[in-house]
């Protein structure tokens, strides 16, 4: 999105529909794909309240995710994302929904582990961090730096770190119970 003041009035201005979405008519596109992706995102599951009825959070944790809530869902980031537009990878949710998942995954009260979904369902590995989504964001959200990169780091640590894999394989309760170690003799 651009301000009208940056254009010269003696040149024609080209307006076109969002390229990624199926074209219906004129500037109208079919946005149903966005709603389908959104339905796959599990909602926030907060930790239970403490005995005094409160939920304690650090202010810095709250401020970190508030940036993500500025999104107005204009889908310009989805339109400019070359993974969605050019490669048409169906397994990639796109920057808008990675922002939404980041707002949930980084919420101080969320109890769900969203890493497997990020990897398998939403295809975070397809993002090659070109920052084109950040450049077009009308709300100046640092999509790549504050959401996508931290999520990719979490996924990499959980699934591709050899030391973490070794630790999980040695301490996995499910593997131990399959071997009969959970039985009391």
Residue ranges and their predicted role:
Residues 13-185:
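Ferredoxin-type iron-sulfur electron-transfer modules in oxidoreductases and energy-metabolism complexes
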Residues 1-19:
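Hydrophobic/aromatic-rich structural module bridging two neighboring secondary-structure elements via a short loop
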